[in-house]
Amino acid sequence: MKDTSLPSTAGAVNKLIDSLGKLPGIGPKSAQRLAFYLMRAPEEQVLTLSDTIRSIKNQISQCRICFNVADSELCPICQNTKREANKICVVEQPQDILALEHVGVYRGYYHVLHGAISPTEGITSQNIRINELMSRLNDGQVDEVILATNPTTEGEATAMYLSRLITPLGIKVTRLARGLPFGTELEYADDVTLSRAMEGRQNF
């Protein structure tokens, strides 16, 4: 990583800039602006931020059913008994759930794989939550699985693999409509595109 340290700046500030610069989407200039903002911010605000970040590591875990982020045994979605129990939407990462929930057109449950099959990176079906998904389909409650993996090479490979596993079970397998450009990650798609992709999902 490019050295972003400033010779005329205190070591503690340089350390903060370096740490912020390691966050996704934060470049050197943004890291500097955030660091100097935090220096000027009220102490209470900075301490609240610090405590919140610490609590993520200490209090946040994975839902035992869908593997979404949770601060108890089940995530809020799996706790909601009013959702449609006959549908499971499969996504790659927890942030994909946030994107789909924001659209508000899907009322079923989710399953988070925590990745996608990628032989070039050494990620196989055993490295993501596929076995757990198959176990959820054994109770006969689910009649549709929506494959909402990202429209990337890895996402498509994962969707194809899942389709081959699930179809023999007699469960309908659908894929988000092609309104999503290839190579786009779900969390960055706009609401209208996501809504149309969910409503126009097709048999896979």
From Swiss-Prot:
The zinc fingers classed as C4-type run over: 63-78
This protein's UniProt keywords: DNA damage, DNA recombination, DNA repair, Metal-binding, Zinc, Zinc-finger
The parts of the chain that form a coiled coil are none
Which InterPro entries did the record assign?
DNA_Rcmb_RecR, Rcmb_RecR, Rcmb_RecR_Znf, TOPRIM_dom, TOPRIM_RecR
Extract one GO molecular function annotation from the record. Answer: DNA binding
Q: Which GO terms describe its biological process?
A: DNA recombination; DNA repair
SMART domains given in the database record: TOPRIM
**All residue ranges annotated as the Toprim domain in the record:** 86-181
Q: Which Pfam families match?
A: RecR_C, RecR_HhH, RecR_ZnF, Toprim_4
- Quote the PROSITE patterns the UniProt record gives: TOPRIM
In which family does this protein belong, per the annotation? Belongs to the RecR family.
Q: What does this protein do?
A: May play a role in DNA repair. It seems to be involved in an RecBC-independent recombinational process of DNA repair. It may act with RecF and RecO.
Name of the featured protein: Recombination protein RecR
What organism is the protein native to? Dehalococcoides mccartyi (strain ATCC BAA-2266 / KCTC 15142 / 195)
